[in-house]
Amino acid sequence: MRSDMIKKGDQQAPARSLLHATGALDKPTDMNKPFVAICNSYIDIVPGHVHLRELADIAKEAIREAGAIPFEFDTIGVDDGIAMGHIGMRYSLPSREIIADAAETVINAHWFDGVFYIPNCDKITPGMLLASVRTNVPAIFCSGGPMKAGLSSEGKALTLSSMFEAVGAFKDGSISKDEFLDMEQNACPTCGSCSGMFTANSMNCLMEVLGLALPYNGTALAVSDQRREMIREAAFKLVDNIKNDLKPKDIVTREAIDDAFALDMAMGGSTNTVLHTLAIANEAGIDYDLTRINEIAKKTPYLSKIAPSSSYSMHDVHEAGGVPAIINELFKKEGTLHPDRITATGKTLRENNEDKEILNSDVIRHLDNPYDKQGGLSILYGNIAPKGAVIKVGGVDPSIKVFKGKAICFDSHDEAVEAIDNHDVREGHVVVIRYEGPKGGPGMPEMLAPTSSIVGRGLGKDVALITDGRFSGATRGIAVGHISPEAAAGGPIGLINDGDEITIDLTNRTLDVNVSTEELDARKQNVKPFKAKVKTGYLARYTALVTSANTGGIMQVPENLI
């Protein structure tokens, strides 16, 4: 066993003394059992994580029953909704790397035989996934699950995105103070990840099709008995995987990445999933080109439209058959998925999901009646984004295929929000927010406040927004993000001037400023070199090492320093 490194032989007697001091070993023969890390992410201020200590206790008990010894440790976590719109959002994406590095450190320092990961919210799941692939120790994931959907006192369905859009509506006088406060009190009624198809739930659904989590991981409610039974089942599966030496890199293959994007397309997932999945592919040593995503989109139908793109919540999806029903429906279209891949259950993707039927065809549609014949995400290319940009087409009004507008440019998120609040942004504008990418932000903050304000003011079909930053999964409207290269890396988004005509063509997947190449080259001569905004601490180190979004916003040490 891997853990023999710290517990076998006379030279490890001091280590064994310390292990006995933990109280985790009831008898001497426990030293002969697999040591299993529980990588938890319990934190009081994140509603998606407040219940994870209870789930970890269930996992510990089950791991012992399965014949192994559990040891729990925690990582950090950032709540994107609480961190939104201020310096906290600069730390959100960078926290993914801290989580990955911290888990790698504990796992490798203590030679665990397997790892049970308990994530839930936005950056925690991908951070742990990066660690699992990097350490390549037998692993399984069981997230904390989504919260129940909110209901206003009048019975209107609510999610966190409803609350963000309500801010714009309240400022605009469209809703009353009483309505505003009622929404605030009722939008998030229980523990769990936010109830729509936002980043957390998108990633937790993708874990099912990647094969590192059990069926229904993405949709079973945080407060449900099913979630607790899933924890127990996953613990037993993990101990089996340790015995069988089934590792993350056996599961996370190029075909698994393809299938993750296919499910993403079928569910209209968050644009952040593109960023995280590309980072995971890189960690697994898979050279994954962005153009591959569009090819997957073209053959994958959009089957389930979930909040913020509709009023349906994750619980509605669960009641309609969950991710297994969507996967099984996609099996019926040959070439969409790779059903014979091995997963952490010890079975293939097909064996996990076959015969799981759709129980409500309003929530999950059949192949012959999709929301769209193509997937809910698109990669756009053009002279603004030569290395790609991402749009959640499933969140755009279906009547919009091409949008042309005049640029109104801002070099920060805050400047854009102020302009929108002051009614400087009007119908026919394309809001350009730049120097907010991974390096420029730093940290590639989410542009949820400006997009929500635009939609909340009733301009969702009349104003577009493009940025080298990113979006919350709660974003909807004509919102193009992840523009690469970013402005701070010399990307052409930094060359756009107020009044330039911009064309967003969703049919042909293009993003262009209607300015000649010669004019853009001339403008380039006047651009001043980017200077890092943060000079000390973690964000300074992050700025120095991070790449643009087209490679997943990963931290890379320059080759000349290796």
UniProtKB/Swiss-Prot annotation:
Co-factor binding comment: Binds 1 [2Fe-2S] cluster per subunit. This cluster acts as a Lewis acid cofactor.
Modified residues (N6-carboxylysine): 123
Reactions catalysed according to its record: (2R)-2,3-dihydroxy-3-methylbutanoate = 3-methyl-2-oxobutanoate + H2O; (2R,3R)-2,3-dihydroxy-3-methylpentanoate = (S)-3-methyl-2-oxopentanoate + H2O
Active-site positions on this chain: 472
Entry binding sites for Mg(2+): 80, 122-123, 446
Molecular-function annotations in GO: 2 iron, 2 sulfur cluster binding; dihydroxy-acid dehydratase activity; magnesium ion binding
Cofactor: [2Fe-2S] cluster; Mg(2+)
Binding-site positions, [2Fe-2S] cluster: 121, 194
Alphabetical GO biological process terms: isoleucine biosynthetic process; L-valine biosynthetic process
Pathway noted in the entry: Amino-acid biosynthesis; L-isoleucine biosynthesis; L-isoleucine from 2-oxobutanoate: step 3/4; Amino-acid biosynthesis; L-valine biosynthesis; L-valine from pyruvate: step 3/4
Keyword terms of this UniProt record: 2Fe-2S, Amino-acid biosynthesis, Branched-chain amino acid biosynthesis, Iron, Iron-sulfur, Lyase, Magnesium, Metal-binding
InterPro entries on file: Dihydro-acid_dehy_C, DihydroxyA_deHydtase, DiOHA_6PGluconate_deHydtase_CS, ILV_EDD_C, ILV_EDD_N, IlvD/EDD_N
Function according to Swiss-Prot or TrEMBL: Functions in the biosynthesis of branched-chain amino acids. Catalyzes the dehydration of (2R,3R)-2,3-dihydroxy-3-methylpentanoate (2,3-dihydroxy-3-methylvalerate) into 2-oxo-3-methylpentanoate (2-oxo-3-methylvalerate) and of (2R)-2,3-dihydroxy-3-methylbutanoate (2,3-dihydroxyisovalerate) into 2-oxo-3-methylbutanoate (2-oxoisovalerate), the penultimate precursor to L-isoleucine and L-valine, respectively.
Assigned protein family: Belongs to the IlvD/Edd family.
NCBIfam families: ilvD (TIGR00110), PRK00911.1 (NF002068)
Oligomeric and partner information: Homodimer.
Protein name stated in the entry: Dihydroxy-acid dehydratase 1
Organism: Staphylococcus saprophyticus subsp. saprophyticus (strain ATCC 15305 / DSM 20229 / NCIMB 8711 / NCTC 7292 / S-41)
